[in-house]
Structure formats: structure tokens, C-alpha cells
């Protein structure tokens, strides 16, 4: 890494109590200042970072040598959406693309079946997910009956129950599933509840949320965070139909080409790797340092998070961007956020501070650069107010 990047990283990690103080030196030149960027919200952060990547491309940087490092895997969604929109190829290193993650496909399958009772692929995926004592032999029986009578799998299941052709134990689970699907469809069509509340009902009433919460491990915690991020994504659409169309489009775009790609990964997964340009988004309290880490491990947890920040910064050989947003969209609601305590630990002399805001009065995405917040007449959210106090 350049000397500026190492100076920032050294200053940060020096705040750990259980560390012998040392100053890192490099054979590389001083290099560019570390960029500290403040955005209005998470969507603007994704736009700003993608714009910066485009600028680096024009300067002949390789996409393979550009990386975005996030604290938690659910954070990739906003960047994936943006990259798909502008046609910027990307890869998830050490992970799976957002809409291809198992729990996201499960949620989408529930919504697809509620929306369209003839969606046999969706039915197949969720009929026994979570487990409802519906075995492979019963599923095979439903498929054969469906094919023979030219019925959808859902209608075939109903008919088999009517004809008393399903085993008693299996019948209870299958009947319960079909009744829930009918209830959720009624919620959507008759009660006209919105698509976000619909998915929340599905997750609670199907037992899917309980299934993930009952097995407390990192994988299931990540799955729950991904589902929360899905609920946030759904808020961007007016109704269920437009959301499902978006998912169909996002999953049909072929990104598996052999050319260069931007790297998206977690900080944990970046250990041992280096890139010319590194973006470190989401440096906000609760997200990074992660609230759970501090709650469970106290000071040790905080120091682990700080070491992770150190790892993230030192993955950059030439240029490092640290950024945070003043507002985040979380489970369908705007929440105010504030810059991570780690931001305060970065040495001023090695930083270039910028505030960015998309100009919403114009059609194109345009940035107001380094303007004072007062001039931009932004919404005075609690996050905005706290940030003002910090910079004055």
C-alpha cells in the first residue's frame, strides 16, 4: 500500500488497546490521500461509487483490480442493482449474487406462487420449505397427477386431497400449506395489503423466519440480514408485479462472461488479497463496527471490528475510498445513521473529505461536489443534524 494508506491504517489500529504500537513503512511513494466520502443515502452511495469506477476505467485501471469491500454480505445488493442497471460487469468473490442466494430465491418463490397459481417451479421450491412432512414420493405423486390431468401442481395437490389419495400425515402438512397460500392470496387481492407486508406475513406464518432464527449460526444470521435487505429492495417498487418483473430481469441478465469484472466481497473474505483501488462503503455505527459484535464481545468485539477496518484499508495498493451514508433504507423504512467511530480515528492530514448529493431536479445523475449542506437544502434528518455538529 502507499504511505498515505498505511498512515491512515496505522493511526486507526493504534486505538486498539491490545496492540503493540508501530508505524508501517512502505517502499511505495506517498500516493493519493485516502478519500472520505459522505452520501445522502445508500442508493446515492452505490451511484457515487459506480461513477468513480467509470472514471477509473477511463484512466485505464483494470476492473479486476478494483474491489468493493463490505462488512456484511447483504450490503452487496445495492451495488449489484446499480451495476446491472449500467451494465458494469461484476463478480461476488467468496459468495453468491444477491438474487441467487437460497433464502432470496425461497422468498421470491413464495411471492411468485401467490401472484400466479400456475407457477410450478415456485410451488416445487417451497411446498416443503420449511419442512412440512411432504416427502419425495408425495411430490412425485403430485407431478404425475398434474401431468396426467393437465393441472398446475397447486390444483393437482388440491384434487389429490379431495380424492383422499394423500397419506394422512402428509395430508395435514400439504393442506396447511395450500390454506396458507390461499390466505396470502386473499391478503393481496381482497385485503390489498402491500407487497412488503405480504412477505412479512409469509415469513412469519409459514415458519420460515422461525426456522432461520431457531438455528443460531453465522450462516442463518446472514440469511436473515439478506431477507431484511430484500424487504428494503421491495419498497422501491409500487406493487408485487413490478417487483417480480424486476427480479426476473435481474436474474436473466447474463453476467457470466470471460471479461474483466469489478470485485464485490466481504472484508473477512479479502484477507491476503490486494487491489489497486478499494472502496469501503457503509462505515456507519451499528453496521461497522457491527452492533452484534460489540453487544456479544464488548471491547474485544470492537477491537476485532477495528482490525477488520485495518485489513480493509490495507487491501488497497494505490487508492482507498471510505464512505458512509446519512440515511439507510431498512425493512421498508428510512432510518437515520451516523458515521462510524472509526471515521473519527482516521488522521485528517491523510484524508480528502467530500460530500456528495445527487441533484434530483435533473434527469441525469449529477453530483453536487463539496457544497455545504445548508446550500443544498437537504432534509434535516437526525443523521444530517448530527453530522453537522461533527464537521463544525
Placement of each model-derived feature along the sequence:
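Conserved helicase motor
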Residues: 70-73, 93-102, 230
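Conserved beta-strand termini and adjacent loop/short-helix elements that scaffold enzyme active sites
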Residues: 27, 39, 93-95, 246, ...
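Acidic, low-complexity intrinsically disordered tails
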Residues: 349-392
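Helicase P-loop NTPase motor core
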Residues: 1-89, 112-116, 187-192
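Conserved helicase C-terminal RecA-like lobe
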Residues: 62, 76-88, 101, 108-349
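Well-ordered alpha-helical segments embedded in enzymatic catalytic cores
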Residues: 45-48, 52, 106, 229, ...
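Structured beta->alpha junctions
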Residues: 38, 72, 96, 130-131, ...
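Proline- and acidic/polar-enriched loop/turn elements at helix boundaries
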Residues: 25, 68, 94-95, 158, ...
